[in-house]
């Protein structure tokens, strides 16, 4: 799958204020590390979804295979992504901001843009290395987040 640096940087920058605003004394303290981990996971997950969508468009002969991969990925990551959104919402509140502050700053068009730029640079290579290598690996794609971002997954799993 594509490198995530631009997405991770953008996600981190959008959450820079989490933890910088003091919360009420009686409420839990903000956990910026958890918010950053959640944002990185969101960015990686969004990039996989965008890549699979672009694969479906560019390699339409294998559209059904990409649909299976997408379904397997979204199904497997749904609990993690629910936790990601819960963390981003709660950490915004703990930082004294409206609940949707962090989630509103995660730009869903960015992953598509990154995938599109990668594909435009070399369409044949994109299809061969980013798309077709995933075909038939529905079981593995569900474990991708934990394999690529193990520390972030551990951090959000231990968040409270």
Where are the regions a protein language model picked out?
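Bacterial N-terminal signal peptides that target proteins for export
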Residues: 1-9
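Bacterial N-terminal signal peptides
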Residues: 10-18
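Immediate post-signal-peptide N-terminus of mature secreted/exported proteins
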Residues: 24-68
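Compact alpha-helical subdomains of small soluble proteins
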Residues: 70-160
């Amino acid at each position: 799958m594509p490198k995530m640096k631009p997405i991770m940087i953008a996600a981190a920058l959008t959450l820079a204020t989490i933890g910088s605003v003091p919360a009420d004394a009686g409420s839990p303290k903000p956990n910026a590390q958890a918010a950053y981990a959640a944002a990185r996971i969101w960015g990686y997950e969004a990039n996989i979804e965008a890549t699979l969508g672009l694969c479906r468009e560019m390699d339409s002969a294998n559209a059904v295979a990409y649909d299976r991969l997408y379904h397997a990925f979204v199904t497997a990551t749904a609990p993690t992504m629910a936790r990601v959104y819960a963390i981003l919402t709660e950490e915004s509140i703990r930082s004294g901001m409206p609940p949707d502050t962090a989630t509103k700053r995660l730009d869903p068009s960015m992953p598509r843009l990154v995938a599109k730029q990668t594909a435009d640079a070399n369409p044949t290579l994109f299809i061969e290395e980013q798309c077709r290598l995933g075909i038939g690996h529905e079981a593995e794609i569900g474990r991708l987040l934990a394999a690529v971002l193990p520390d972030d997954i551990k951090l959000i799993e231990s968040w409270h």
